[in-house]
Design a protein with these regions (language model features):
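Conserved small/polar residues in nucleotide/adenosyl-binding loops
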Residues: 181-182, 404-406
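Glycine-rich helix-loop "coupling/hinge" segments at transmembrane-helix boundaries
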Residues: 220-244, 326-329
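Transmembrane helix boundary and interhelical loop/hinge segments in multi-pass membrane proteins
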Residues: 43-46, 167-180, 189, 202, ...
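Short, Lys/Arg-rich, polar N-terminal cytosolic tail immediately upstream
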Residues: 1-6
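Helix-loop-helix hairpin linking two adjacent transmembrane segments in secondary transporters
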Residues: 235-260
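Feature of multi-pass inner-membrane transport and sensor proteins
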Residues: 191, 228-234, 263-296, 327
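Membrane-water interface segments at the C-terminal ends of transmembrane alpha-helices
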Residues: 9-40, 55-172, 200-221, 252-269, ...
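Glycine/proline-centered hinge or cleavage motifs at structural transition points of membrane proteins
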Residues: 185-187, 199
Length: 406
């Protein structure tokens, strides 16, 4: 059967997008993998780099530390975010939008900023550590920030919004008819929670854990700022490449860093397919009932979460406009004088804005075209499946990983 003009155009666009994704994703990863089997001179040496890495006890400690930080941070963030999302979806408290927007604030800041704020708050000369600069000594609290404690706090703050978004959606689409049937049978709230609520959002829990794990596992900013001497894989990559100029070993660490992320991401994709068949058009939206004791608890809990988030941003804001934090808190704009640094802050902002704008336009266009071409076809071709896979692969990749080969 002869193809129509529209079908020919769609095939051409599909091949173009596939070629584009191959250039920006497959080629860098291919070069990265090839580099891991070479020495710094470019000679093929097989698995020697991997053997050297795994026989070094110090490098194995980094892997162990990374797995520990990722697991603990993911569990804590899920507990906090689920409780927060439950307060949004299953209570009758007021100001839900305010709580939600404040809880989402960390999403718009890098983990490096979170780490810097924590240093100003809980570092050796931090506001909380010194009892608010010895004005409230009774409130002084040293949490021993530098190391796993600081990394976990910074990572939880970073991944909290992403986990909250997933769990908030999962709770919002639970079928209310199940609760109505349970009420008719006289089921207690405790039993409804464990037999209806949790089973219905189990895929949300799995997805949120995997997202949190990947983001933490591949993050560089928080360990760099508050990690101290506590090594993780992301900082190992930086040390190998920038500090030691050992590109081959940096590629090895990058591959090791990539494997758990890809496995976790593939599991997440399988989970999402199962999640899509749980709900249907006949599902009813959950309608929470009034409960003063429950609502009071969530008012307190969500206020505490929001106060901590606000304190992080306020600390950064105040320190930026202070003459010399924490010794001289006099208002000053001298910290914004970048005129001696390669053109000044205007040039920095201009370059960042242009890069973000171009990336946003190109990324949005390519993503829309890819989604349109794939979803508008009744039968998916091999090219369509490859486009889908290559489009989601970057979500499982560390930010710096694809650039190691350069």
């Amino acid at each position: 059967m002869e193809k129509t003009k529209d079908e020919v155009i769609k095939e051409i666009l599909t091949l173009f997008i596939l070629a584009f994704l191959a250039v920006i994703i497959i080629c860098p990863l291919g070069l990265l993998i090839a580099k891991s089997f070479q020495n710094n001179g470019g000679e093929f040496i097989g698995f020697k780099n991997f053997h050297e890495y795994f026989t070094n006890p110090n490098t194995l400690i980094s892997l162990k530390n990374t797995l520990f930080i990722s697991t603990i941070s993911s569990i804590i963030s899920i507990v906090l975010a689920f409780t927060f999302a439950y307060g949004i979806q299953r209570t009758t408290i007021k100001f839900k939008n305010i709580f939600k927007y404040i809880g989402m604030l960390p999403l718009f800041a890098p983990t490096m900023m979170h780490g810097i704020a924590l240093v100003y708050m809980f570092g050796r000369k931090g506001a909380v550590t010194t009892g608010f600069f010895e004005k409230l000594p009774a409130l002084a609290w040293d949490i021993n920030l530098y190391g796993p404690t600081g990394i976990i706090i910074a990572e939880v703050l970073y991944i909290f919004p992403q986990v909250f978004l997933v769990l908030n959606i999962a709770l919002s689409v639970t079928d209310y008819r199940l609760y109505e049937a349970a009420d008719m049978l006289g089921t207690s709230n405790f039993r409804k929670f464990f037999t209806i609520t949790l089973p219905n959002i189990k895929y949300g829990f799995i997805s949120s854990f995997i997202i949190a794990f990947i983001l933490t596992f591949t993050d560089f900013g928080a360990p760099k700022v508050v990690g101290g001497n506590y090594s993780v894989l992301a900082t190992d990559v930086y040390i190998k490449v920038v500090g030691q100029n050992n590109m081959a070993m940096g590629a090895v660490v990058s591959i090791i860093l990539l494997i758990p992320s890809v496995i976790a991401f593939l599991i997440d994709q399988k989970v999402q397919k199962k999640q899509s068949v749980v709900f249907n058009a006949k599902s009813k939206v959950y309608v929470p009932k009034k409960d003063n004791l429950r609502d009071t608890f969530y008012y307190i809990y969500m206020t505490l979460i929001c106060l901590f988030v606000i304190s992080v941003f306020v600390t950064i804001f105040v320190s930026a406009f202070s003459k010399l934090w924490p010794y001289d808190l006099t208002f000053s704009l001298k910290n914004f004088k970048f005129y001696d640094y390669n053109g000044g802050v205007a040039l920095f902002f201009k370059n960042s804005f242009i890069l973000a704008l171009l990336s946003g336009i190109l990324g949005t266009f390519m993503t829309f075209m890819s989604a349109y071409l794939i979803e508008k076809k009744e039968k998916k071709t091999i090219a369509d499946k490859m486009i889908y896979f290559l489009s989601i692969v970057p979500l499982a990749l560390p930010g710096m990983l694809s650039l190691i080969h350069i």
